[in-house]
């Protein structure tokens, strides 16, 4: 099986750091990077005929389509079972952490920026490990 990694964040520096950490940790050699949820959603919609498994490192606060809107948009889609999501955010709002429990695709809720040890932790999650 294969797992593709999507990094979805509007902060240019965070995207660069997360991409470096994902590659350095061996989580993915070529993560795909998106500026906000809408572009990631459109990409996934276009993949529906040849769908891989995706790990999405998703920020909450972004323009156009934020992380919660992205998660709402994928619910009920035929490809939703091929998606695993780790929320990677600067939010310290307990309400955001609680809201994350409402989405079965969310594996965890981590603070950014990601470091190699966080990527190694993500790799160790059973759902992710089974796809690597």
Give residue ranges: language-model regions.
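Alpha4 helix (beta4-alpha4-beta5 surface) of REC/receiver domains from two-component response regulators
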Residues: 69, 82, 92-108, 116, ...
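Helix N-cap/capping motif at the beta->alpha junctions
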Residues: 33-42, 67
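Conserved acidic segment of CheY-like receiver
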Residues: 3-14, 18-22
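Conserved sequence signature across two-component system core domains
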Residues: 8-10, 34, 56-59
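Hydrophobic/aromatic residues positioned on beta-strands within the core alpha/beta folds
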Residues: 86-89
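Short amphipathic alpha-helix used as the core "switch/output" element in two-component signaling
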Residues: 42, 68-81
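Active-site beta3 strand of CheY-like receiver
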Residues: 48-57
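Receiver (REC) domain active-site loop signature in two-component systems and cognate sites
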Residues: 62
């Amino acid at each position: 099986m294969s797992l593709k990694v999507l990094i979805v964040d509007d902060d240019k520096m965070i995207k660069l750091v997360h991409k470096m950490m994902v590659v350095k940790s061996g989580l993915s050699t070529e993560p795909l990077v998106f500026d906000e949820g809408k572009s990631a959603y459109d990409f996934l919609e276009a993949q529906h005929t040849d769908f891989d498994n995706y790990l999405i490192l998703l920020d909450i606060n972004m323009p156009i389509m934020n992380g919660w809107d992205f998660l709402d948009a994928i619910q009920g889609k035929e490809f939703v079972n091929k998606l695993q999501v780790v929320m990677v955010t600067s939010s310290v709002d307990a309400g955001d952490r609680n809201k994350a429990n409402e989405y079965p695709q969310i594996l965890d809720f981590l603070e950014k920026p990601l470091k190699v040890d966080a990527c190694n932790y993500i790799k160790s999650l059973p759902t992710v490990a089974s796809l690597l």
